[in-house]
UniProtKB/Swiss-Prot annotation:
Organism phylogeny: Eukaryota, Metazoa, Chordata, Craniata, Vertebrata
Molecular function, one GO term: identical protein binding
Subunit comment: Homooligomer. Interacts with CASP1, CASP4, CARD8 and RIPK2.
Regions annotated as coiled coil: none
Keyword 4Fe-4S recorded: no
Annotated ranges, domain CARD: 1-91
Keywords carried by this UniProt record: Protease inhibitor, Thiol protease inhibitor
CDD domains: CARD_CASP1-like (cd08325)
Superkingdom field: Eukaryota
Name of this chain's protein: Caspase recruitment domain-containing protein 16
Organism from which the protein derives: Homo sapiens (Human)
Pfam families: CARD
Length: 197
């Protein structure tokens, strides 16, 4: 919702922003980690006029989503009430706060936790790996019941054996339920003596 408000008010926002407000907003967005230091310096360094800085700032905040835009709107409403009134942000802020359809987050405090791009990419990769591994386990357990040599070879050659399979498959191996046809594999995984060839 807040991102839609900023998109609608973009042109008026660019023409109305003052030097002090843009600098304060940049500091606020850095402090709340909407922008990182590099992004803030880029906005300041590469744009000579206040309008250019405002344009660059708004164009970097809007793609970051509703929570980032909400922080921007809240700062303007609290620090520059005249600008907020000019842009019609006071009413928009109230509408956003009253809207129960605002997206919630997964943080324990009930707020969205903003992070750096590198952290977001790392988390995304971890989730993708988890999904891939879970799908692989299911496929392998289904295919291995046929006892094919190809499956045994694939299982032994996988990079996951050293780190992942030792932890995930140890319990089923102890029970002898999933992979009974690979002699000694449970012991090798347990002691870490299995070597990839």
């Amino acid at each position: 919702m807040a991102d839609k408000v900023l998109k609608e008010k973009r042109k008026l926002f660019i023409h109305s922003m003052g030097e002090g407000t843009i600098n304060g907003l940049l500091d606020e967005l850095l402090q709340t980690r909407v922008l990182n230091q590099e992004e803030m310096e880029k906005v300041k360094r590469e744009n000579a006029t206040v309008m250019d800085k405002t344009r660059a700032l708004i164009d970097s905040v809007i793609p970051k989503g509703a929570q980032a835009c909400q922080i921007c709107i809240t700062y303007i409403c609290e620090e520059d009430s005249y600008l907020a009134e000019t842009l019609g942000l006071s009413a928009a802020l109230q509408a956003v706060q009253d809207n129960p359809a605002m997206p919630t987050c997964s943080s324990p405090e009930g707020r969205i936790k903003l992070c750096f791009l590198e952290d977001a990419q790392r988390i995304w990769k971890q989730k993708l790996q988890r999904c891939h591994v879970q799908n692989t386990i299911i496929k392998w357990s289904e295919r291995y019941t046929s006892g094919s040599f190809e499956m045994q070879w694939l299982f032994l050659r996988t990079n996951f054996i050293e780190r992942f399979w030792r932890n995930i498959l140890l319990l089923p191996l102890h029970k002898g339920s999933l992979y009974p046809r690979i002699p000694g594999l449970g012991k090798e995984l347990q002691t870490g003596t299995h070597k990839l060839s």
